[in-house]
Amino acid sequence: MSLIPSIFGGRRTNVFDPFSLDVFDPFEGFLTPSGLANAPAMDVAAFTNAKVDWRETPEAHVFKADLPGLRKEEVKVEVEDGNILQISGERSNENEEKNDKWHRVERSSGKFTRRFRLPENAKMEEIKASMENGVLSVTVPKVPEKKPEVKSIDISG
């Protein structure tokens, strides 16, 4: 599978997947007076739709989520219904000083939840998570594949 960086948003996409969601939208921002008028809404959407990479190695499923500005106490990693990995978090606004004169407020607050159905080969009881520099890493070890038992048969004659 060939992965290339997208020139329309910096995300990665599979160039051979006709159903890839990473497509250029020529009408994005069309109904707003200015393309910049939609920027704060896009920032909120970027937070509420936290970007998560999921890769599979021979030993584990590894999830990496970009959560800039969040502390590990503001993030939850849970398993629901036995095989649904849920990553959620909440960013709150700082206390505003009513007497201050604000020139610009761009940082957003909000909640996000991302859910992933884990495959049958995931070891749910051994999931580990860590967070460093705003990047959450979740490692889900895999059950080793059972190799078929091969028995050699002597050929007589």
Curated annotation (Swiss-Prot):
Query: Could you tell me the keywords of this UniProt record?
Result: Cytoplasm, Stress response
An example GO CC term for this entry is: cytoplasm
**Major site of localization recorded for this protein:** cytoplasm
- Location(s) in or outside the cell: Cytoplasm
The answer to keyword S-adenosyl-L-methionine applying to this record is no
The superkingdom listed in its UniProt entry is: Eukaryota
Q: Where are the transmembrane segments?
A: none
Q: Where is the sHSP domain?
A: 43-157
Q: Which PANTHER family match?
A: HEAT-SHOCK PROTEIN 20 FAMILY MEMBER
Q: How does it assemble?
A: May form oligomeric structures.
What protein family is recorded? Belongs to the small heat shock protein (HSP20) family.
Protein name, as recorded:
17.6 kDa class I heat shock protein 3
| Protein's gene | HSP17.6C
